[in-house]
């Protein structure tokens, strides 16, 4: 039995999505870290997550996107010392930004479900392979082998499921859906 229910405002949906995107990013990074460990990697999770990026040649794709955007706006070349902070900020910003978009869309639904995150993760994955080649940061999708694409898709599905589940939990908490005391665990 519901005692009270608060509606989700657009701003609350955006913030919930932003937070859910952070959780989804943690889930995706956990998936990738476990693959790294299975392949023989020895670093701790934090050392792996925040491994120094000493130059743009070592920067992951989110960092290269950030570099291209900043250099485009400022018309100045970013020095190598910015490779690590830009890559880290872009990675977490990208994950939380997509989560905010998820929050806006899922927040407009009557009853968003955690599994809605799966098609969301697939959409993020497919947009990466559509947009990043145009920016010169990825090869066209047909130039990747099936194993690389499958691993990357799986990581994005994990991201989507983590984002969808976190959004569902956050919005249930926000809306104040509770049960009557006699139905509570241990009552």
Task: Give the residues covered by each predicted segment.
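Short amphipathic, positively biased membrane-proximal segments
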Residues: 1-187
């Amino acid at each position: 039995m519901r005692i009270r229910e608060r509606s989700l405002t657009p701003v609350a949906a955006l913030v919930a999505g932003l937070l859910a995107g952070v959780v989804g990013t943690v889930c995706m990074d956990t998936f990738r870290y476990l693959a790294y460990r299975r392949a023989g990697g020895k670093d701790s999770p934090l050392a792996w997550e925040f491994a120094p990026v000493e130059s743009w040649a070592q920067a992951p794709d989110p960092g290269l996107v950030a570099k291209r955007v900043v250099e485009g706006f400022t018309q100045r070349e970013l020095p190598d010392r910015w490779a690590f902070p830009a890559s880290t900020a872009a990675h977490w910003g990208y994950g939380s930004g997509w989560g905010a978009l998820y929050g806006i869309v899922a927040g407009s639904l009557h009853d968003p479900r955690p599994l809605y995150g799966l098609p969301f993760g697939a959409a993020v994955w497919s947009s990466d392979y559509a947009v990043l080649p145009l920016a010169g940061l990825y090869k066209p999708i047909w130039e990747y082998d099936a194993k690389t694409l499958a691993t990357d898709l799986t990581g994005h599905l994990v991201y989507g499921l983590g984002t969808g589940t976190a959004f569902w939990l956050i919005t249930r908490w926000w809306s104040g859906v509770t049960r009557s005391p006699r139905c509570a665990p241990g009552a």
